[in-house]
């Protein structure tokens, strides 16, 4: 007999742990399992193993709302973040619900039975289980393959070419010349870490620059409050301080982009040698927050540049050579190792497909509702975090809403909920109003968002608190239904 559960959660990273905790806390009678395709939990924090891996936002907002972050670092390294996620799962018994090596291949919705059949591959064997509600918490990255553009002459290079998503544990880079291609969060994390841990010299080669902000890796206010207040109270206070600060910076960038650009470049200039061409190497041709700001703790990247361990080169690649990279300017960069920190590939729902009564779902024709459900797909929610703030802020809100939704359905005898696509008064817009390369490459494969609430993705935690945490469940956009009574009853 096929196993049946009330809820199936896909993914055992931060989003999956949040979903499970909220289910246990707010829907304690619901049975559930977490399906994780990898051999261990932690998602991003277990997958990425490159030197220097760390958070790119503070842990008081990246941490769960329900469990305080107690580490000393506000900008934390990957290992303690992974331990935090794992220990949270163990503390609340969530780890007992995780089924590892369970890759979801497809999910089929039956209107007649009001349930999903989830098809799974585990150790080469196919199986299935059914559930009332499907909660997709696998993020939007392709965990199997990062983005690596084709570079002319790459076959000529005699050294290793490595993508950070697949970092070899035995890579020896001591006293080596390294070129890191890229300018995003991965590159600005890797470059100073490599320079400080044995590399002879590191070059960050970028086609165009990114806005970079330096921030202390410790929070002085948090340290004081932790001495004066109970743990949970101190954590909540610092969390709100940082939420409001993030919102204020983002709002200022939207209102006064030129002024904020000038301020960011001025702050960078103070940390670099006199005469350094900040505009060329750290002055993007777009406004702040059109793409995510990159964070460097304690100015580590700028310190490495000052000490001569790191050089930033802004140029384009002609081809790889046997001993490095030839640029279109004619310059050649010597390299023993080349690292392609060139981005990620987007992949919603872990690559799983969905059908409704045998008909394939084309998610590109759907519209997102509150950034967590898709039009026309019954009894399904997904978690995608913020692009301009910590991922977990949105993950916790989505988990809260799903629990409120399930309880509302139980209280009113409903078996299904589906998002109805709005009429022509709501204009279609791209799923993300965000322009990094990994998003632009995949926009045609993503759902749409709408021009107004609740179809518009706010990217605003304060607005989402009103909309998601405090808003009505039975509002515009959702249609609830009860299973028809059997004939003769």
Swiss-Prot record:
NADP(+) binds at residues 54-56, 183-189, 207-208. Binds 1 FAD per subunit. InterPro entries: FAD-binding_MO (IPR051820), FAD/NAD-bd_sf (IPR036188), Flavin_mOase-like (IPR020946). One of its GO terms (cellular component) is cytosol. GO terms for biological process: xenobiotic metabolic process. Its EC number is 1.14.13.-. The record marks 292 as: Transition state stabilizer. The keyword Flavoprotein applies. The keyword ATP-binding does not apply. Activity can be increased by one order of magnitude by adding bovine serum albumin in vitro. This result suggests that the enzyme is activated in vivo by protein-protein or interactions with other cellular components. PANTHER family: MONOOXYGENASE, PUTATIVE (AFU_ORTHOLOGUE AFUA_8G02570)-RELATED. This is FAD-containing monooxygenase EthA.
